[in-house]
A protein has these predicted regions:
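Alpha/beta catalytic cores of group-transfer enzymes, especially the acyltransferase/condensing modules
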Residues: 134-193
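Helix-rich "cap/lid" substructures immediately adjacent to catalytic or cofactor-binding pockets
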Residues: 2-123
Length: 193
């Protein structure tokens, strides 16, 4: 009996990480599994329908269509746009949720009967709360809710990217734009040259 299938007889919790998730690598993994990639692509397509009323606004930020190739051909990456600078959140927020959904589906294929032995708890750190909600929807078999959660992830990402661009937030190497600092004076946050 594998560790994953042993969870069918044991209480367990599901936890979902936030922005520090190496989401591009995780999305690449699921993109090369045709079965998982097709399911996640279906959720993304369903989210397109949810977002149709705001499609034009998303197009002004170049995120009306996510640059995700699911499934991806052998040797190719899932995310067809390079690191996007201030627009990275428009890709990373939904990209993380897509990777988390793919991981959940992979757990079921590895032997976890998530329908008959559901998690005793769900926890999400930061944007991991979106992972919690898409997991709950998926476990309940509510594909429409899963699409709505994914659409929300896309809107949050687009909004974060827009605010980052408007604020002309400086980029520091590989550091993320998704940082919130409170209670610290501007003088401490301003680079001194």
């Amino acid at each position: 009996m594998s560790f994953v299938s042993s969870l069918n007889e044991t209480p367990y919790a599901l936890t979902f990480a936030g922005q520090a998730t190496p989401w591009r690598a995780a999305l690449d993994e699921i993109a090369h599994d045709p079965e998982i990639a097709a399911i996640v692509a279906g959720v993304i397509e369903a989210s397109d329908k949810v977002l149709s009323p705001v499609r034009r606004s998303l197009a002004t930020q170049s995120v009306s269509v996510l640059p995700f190739t699911l499934p991806a051909p052998d040797g190719e990456v899932a995310v067809t746009r390079e690191v996007a600078g201030p627009d990275e959140a428009a890709l990373s927020v939904p990209g993380i949720v897509a990777a988390q959904l793919g991981a959940l589906i992979d757990l079921t294929r590895a032997g976890l009967n998530i329908m008959s032995n559901q998690p005793t708890a769900f926890e999400g750190h930061s944007q991991g709360v979106l992972g919690v909600e898409i997991a709950r929807a998926w476990i309940a078999g509510d594909e429409a809710r899963a699409a709505s959660v994914f659409a929300l992830a896309r809107l949050i990402g687009a909004a974060a990217a827009r605010v980052t661009r408007r604020a002309r937030a400086p980029h520091a190497g590989d550091a993320t734009y998704m940082v919130s600092v409170r209670g610290v004076s501007d003088a401490l946050l301003t680079p001194h040259h």
